[in-house]
A protein has these predicted regions:
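NAD(P)H-binding glycine-rich loop region in Rossmannoid oxidoreductase-like domains
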Residues: 71, 80-141, 145-148
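Short-chain dehydrogenase/reductase
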Residues: 129-136, 175, 187-197, 247-252
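Conserved Rossmann-fold NAD(P)-dependent oxidoreductase catalytic core, especially the SDR/UDP-sugar
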Residues: 141-190
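Conserved beta-loop-beta element that borders a ligand/cofactor-binding pocket
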Residues: 199-225
Length: 281
């Protein structure tokens, strides 16, 4: 639930509210603060889907925070030159599902977090062609690779998902018309089922007490392109119909929130094992 937005001397605050925890985040100055605080505590994060519209913005956010970032991409053509040349960026050019088990284990080795921004291209081939289980299979293989390494620390896994996917742990209420539409999407549009299955893998196979992997599945509403970070609201479940009145979430806000999850332990503790929904204010 959203508690409130406060304007104070050109500083805009957003308030995240969970039944027992409230956090205020300075949206205009936060990135500078984060970069200063975490420069001495740099983490390594693996990002898959980094060449996509949201993945690029996430990578930029992480690098601005002084973090070390590894990306697995088929091509760097969609990435800005200043990102590709950044001293804290490591690029692995490969198709993630073509990597061997040993290569996958090597790439996730020593990573503190993994973020998946994978998705299907919005074309006929992208929607109906192979691989139909891109997000699910990548999630499963990345988690298996983490476990294969037997890390001595808990690894964070952040999955970019969708408000069209329900958190079945919470038995979220959905109207009958929406259930009908979602059922058709599940049968007729492979990427929707893929998104559902990927989140279900984290929810049921990794669960709440894995000991090696902790996870968050981030559910934005309809994605938009905006030039700057703006206030957002964060909720445990959708507050509006994902089909008939979805609302908007800018890609830069999604990247910002996922970067916050990786680098802010208090925010991570608030949402781990959950599927937070984010909307633009």
């Amino acid at each position: 639930m959203f508690k409130g937005v406060q304007d104070c001397s050109n500083i805009r605050w957003i308030v995240y509210f969970n039944p027992s925890i409230t956090i205020r985040i300075d949206l205009l100055k936060r990135i500078t603060i984060i970069s200063t605080i975490f420069a001495a505590v740099s983490m390594t994060t693996l990002v898959v889907g980094a060449s996509g519209a949201t993945g690029r913005l996430l990578v930029e956010q992480m690098l601005e925070r002084g973090q070390h970032v590894r990306i697995i991409v088929r091509s760097t053509d969609n990435l800005p030159s200043e990102v590709i040349s950044h001293k804290n960026l490591s690029v692995i050019c490969a198709s993630i599902l073509d990597l061997s088990e040993s290569d996958m284990a090597e790439h996730v080795g020593e990573c503190d977090a993994i973020v998946s921004c994978l998705g299907h291209n919005l074309s006929f081939k992208g929607i109906f062609g192979k691989p139909r289980r891109l997000v699910t299979d990548a999630t499963r293989r990345l988690c298996n690779a983490v476990k294969e390494n037997s890390p001595n620390k808990t690894v964070k896994f952040v999955l970019m998902n969708s408000t069209g996917n329900s958190n079945r742990d919470l038995k979220e209420r959905i109207s009958f018309p929406q259930k009908c539409v979602i059922g058709l999407l599940r049968l007729l549009v492979p990427p929707h089922a893929d998104n559902e299955n990927a989140a279900d893998y984290l929810r049921t196979k990794i669960g709440q007490s894995d000991g090696v992997i902790e996870w968050v599945a981030v559910r934005p509403a309809s994605l938009t392109n905006e030039p700057e970070i703006t206030p957002i609201t964060v909720h445990p479940s959708p507050t509006r119909s994902a089909i008939f009145n979805d609302g908007k979430t800018s890609r830069i806000n999604v990247g910002y929130f996922m970067a916050e999850l990786v680098t802010d332990e208090s925010l991570w503790d608030m949402w781990k094992g959950q599927m937070p929904v984010i909307y633009n204010v």
